[in-house]
């Protein structure tokens, strides 16, 4: 029911019609990848593309380059992708899901590793529209579902590899989320997950009072030991830490493509090792878990 409602709202969105008009032009496009997703069309639709992209702000994940238009997104998402890139060989000829896929940046980047199938899940109309704009030009076989992680167990297709990046701390029941990820896997499937974490040897999690780094929907920020316990309780047998990284103002910053504040405004101005609330500043752990 929720999916049908979101799909209806998406299809009735005025920008969807504009994107379909652009798609109908069937513009020749050279699609290439480096740190940004690059689309070269040399078309006469540049003004229309600029208008649509501006109306689709904020652009969080990226960057994207469409001809001479550079969408300088809030996150330099290639930094996260490059952390995971040494492990991307595991998606070759595999059925892959990206849970919380935002506008599809990571999925576009994954194409160079030749997955057999690539499906993104995110119940956000705005992010789906951003994806549809890029894909109207790129013409990739990526599929985008207006669904959340809770829809995985009954989706009807199981995955060899699932990416779930920057989602778990937004969930009020992280173990349930991990169980949903497990239910979406094929036998011998693998999950790549990242989360903010706290430095502590104990099996504990930070439960922010109202906000964490000015973000209201952060429920739990675990220690790595606590995260491992969550994964084991959800039924995962293998837990491997791939990397850790502190989030800095090079990776996340305010640009003209967002109309709100960013990391520099979320940290204590006197001590960048603390959030504005006095918690540890954001840092992330990247893990690979298997059943």
Curated annotation (Swiss-Prot):
Binding sites annotated in the UniProt record for carboxy-S-adenosyl-L-methionine:
61, 75, 80, 100, 122-124, 149-150, 169, 284
Query: Is Lipid metabolism a UniProt keyword of this protein?
Result: no
Q: Name one GO molecular function term.
A: transferase activity, transferring alkyl or aryl (other than methyl) groups
Q: Which principal EC class is assigned to this enzyme? A: transferase
Provide the catalytic activity annotation: carboxy-S-adenosyl-L-methionine + 5-hydroxyuridine(34) in tRNA = 5-carboxymethoxyuridine(34) in tRNA + S-adenosyl-L-homocysteine + H(+)
Tell me the keywords, alphabetical order: Transferase, tRNA processing
Matching entries from InterPro entries are given as: CmoB, Mo5U34_MeTrfas-like, SAM-dependent_MTases_sf
One GO biological process term is:
tRNA wobble uridine modification
* UniProt cross-references to Gene3D superfamilies, sorted A to Z: Vaccinia Virus protein VP39
Task: Say which domain of life the source belongs to.
Answer: Bacteria
Coiled-coil ranges per the record?
Answer: none
Which SUPFAM superfamilies does this chain map to? S-adenosyl-L-methionine-dependent methyltransferases (SSF53335)
Answer yes or no on keyword Transferase. Answer: yes
Q: What is its EC number?
A: 2.5.1.-
What is the documented function of this protein?
Catalyzes carboxymethyl transfer from carboxy-S-adenosyl-L-methionine (Cx-SAM) to 5-hydroxyuridine (ho5U) to form 5-carboxymethoxyuridine (cmo5U) at position 34 in tRNAs.
Its family remark reads: Belongs to the class I-like SAM-binding methyltransferase superfamily. CmoB family.
Question: What do we know about how this protein assembles, alone or with others?
Answer: Homotetramer.
Q: What is this protein called?
A: tRNA U34 carboxymethyltransferase
Q: Which organism is it from?
A: Campylobacter jejuni subsp. doylei (strain ATCC BAA-1458 / RM4099 / 269.97)
